[in-house]
């Protein structure tokens, strides 16, 4: 099997719009959570989010394609531009090349575009009033459709949509295709819009934090006893995933090698995880790993049930060894749903490169059931070699990715 490495990254997130801004926020444990007037006006109970702050984002986007793009596509476009520059790829290396592809997904497409379309019909009573661009904007494959066109990609071109595991699946699938020799390079990741139209559904099911509306930066509190739900976020992330020899042939900078990918299904409950699927997933990812995991960026989102189920699964997986250092970057960033897997992989890559571990913040009283789980609550400087990142989603879908420092 061919070896697979990561040579470039780009990100738009609640804690920064490029890798330097994101690195600074991580090192300072600077929260990206803020008050949302939009959510308050909509009548939601939760008034906090991990907002995306962008200026002049339409700049240099072909208008013929821009009209088809939703917010997630725009975030992903900006991330892909960064990733291409970061990987030092010339247009000749990726344009019109059948060995270069895109696998970029979204968990929801664009509820904002869908609701806008329906609202126009209700208001005008005319189907023809709906924008002809609504279909493309609303598709969960909108990102890959738009980016493959803008960047002239001729290799694989599709999206995976698997709730909050979406972009992690995209990375894992990219790894497999390259291992099998079907592609040399794949742009992999995902994006998610941030809007009341998307957030309201989670608010209605009681999944979002509501207790800390007046203190937004305290609202995402993974493993804290008083956690009361997750904080919704958005953005995008793109990785340049390459076959090792292909990367070496062009003297590419290598962030890390992807050495493990596990995926599984709970087959248990649509919204409540079983824990068994997560255990199988982590074990599959580690099946060819000999060295210990130095750090695990958990999926845990700040929900009463989900956080403890993941911790129990981790305890079972590592019961014969020692539990790796654990933390959740979502305590700083919020939960960007389909974009979370790739964003958290980027946070992990930066930690691996610069040898530090971001703590879980806002743990004022650790949940008693989370004791003795090696949860990090203060910034740590540590030489790192191997990192695991978990991403789980509704429907019992699970992904574990493992990266190793390339020496």
Swiss-Prot record:
GO biological process annotation, one example: fatty acid biosynthetic process
GO molecular function: 3-oxoacyl-[acyl-carrier-protein] synthase activity
Ketosynthase family 3 (KS3) domain sequence ranges: 1-405
Pfam families per UniProt: ketoacyl-synt, Ketoacyl-synt_C
GO cellular component annotations of the record: cytosol
Gene3D superfamilies: 3.40.47.10
Residues passing through the membrane, by range: none
Keywords: Acyltransferase, Cytoplasm, Fatty acid biosynthesis, Fatty acid metabolism, Lipid biosynthesis, Lipid metabolism, Transferase
Enzyme class: transferase
Location (main, coarse): cytoplasm
EC number assigned by the record: 2.3.1.41
Catalytic activity entry: a fatty acyl-[ACP] + malonyl-[ACP] + H(+) = a 3-oxoacyl-[ACP] + holo-[ACP] + CO2; (3Z)-decenoyl-[ACP] + malonyl-[ACP] + H(+) = 3-oxo-(5Z)-dodecenoyl-[ACP] + holo-[ACP] + CO2
UniProt subunit comment: Homodimer.
Name of the protein: 3-oxoacyl-[acyl-carrier-protein] synthase 1
Originating species: Buchnera aphidicola subsp. Baizongia pistaciae (strain Bp)
Gene that this sequence comes from: fabB
């Amino acid at each position: 099997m061919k070896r697979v490495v990561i040579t470039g990254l780009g990100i738009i997130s609640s804690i920064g719009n490029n890798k330097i801004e994101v690195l600074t926020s991580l090192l300072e444990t600077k929260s990206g959570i803020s008050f949302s007037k939009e959510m308050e006006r909509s009548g939601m109970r939760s008034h906090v989010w991990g907002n995306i702050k962008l200026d002049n984002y339409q700049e240099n986007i072909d208008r013929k394609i821009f009209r088809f793009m939703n917010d997630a596509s725009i975030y992903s476009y900006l991330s892909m531009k960064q990733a291409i520059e970061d990987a030092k790829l010339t247009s000749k290396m990726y344009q019109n090349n059948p060995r270069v592809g895109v696998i970029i997904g979204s968990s929801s497409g664009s509820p904002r575009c869908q609701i806008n379309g329906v609202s126009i019909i209700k208001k005008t009573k005319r189907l023809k009033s709906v924008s002809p661009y609504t279909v493309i904007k609303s598709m969960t494959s909108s990102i890959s459709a738009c980016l493959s066109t803008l960047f002239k990609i001729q290799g694989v071109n599709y999206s995976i949509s698997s709730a909050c595991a979406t972009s992690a699946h995209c990375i894992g699938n990219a790894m497999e295709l390259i291992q099998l020799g079907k592609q040399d390079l794949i742009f992999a990741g995902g994006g998610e819009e941030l809007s009341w139209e998307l957030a309201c559904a989670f608010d209605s099911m009681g999944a979002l934090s509501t207790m800390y509306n007046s203190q937004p930066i305290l609202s995402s509190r993974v493993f804290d006893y008083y956690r009361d739900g997750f904080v919704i976020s958005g953005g995008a992330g793109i990785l340049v995933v390459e076959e090792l020899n292909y990367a070496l042939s062009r003297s590419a900078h290598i962030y890390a090698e992807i050495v493990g990918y596990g995926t599984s299904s709970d087959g248990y409950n649509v919204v409540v995880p079983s824990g068994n699927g997560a255990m199988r997933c982590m074990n599959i990812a580690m099946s060819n790993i000999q060295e210990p995991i130095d750090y695990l960026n958990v999926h845990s989102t700040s929900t009463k049930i989900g956080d403890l189920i993941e911790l129990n699964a981790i305890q079972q997986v590592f019961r014969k060894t020692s539990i790796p250092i654990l933390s959740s970057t979502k305590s700083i960033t919020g939960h960007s749903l389909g974009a979370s897997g790739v964003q958290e992989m980027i946070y992990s890559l930066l930690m691996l490169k610069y040898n530090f571990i971001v703590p879980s913040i806002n743990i004022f009283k650790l949940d008693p059931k989370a004791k003795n789980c090696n949860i990090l609550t203060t910034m740590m400087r540590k030489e790192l070699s191997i990192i695991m990142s978990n991403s789980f989603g509704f429907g019992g879908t699970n992904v574990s990715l493992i990266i190793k420092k390339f020496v």
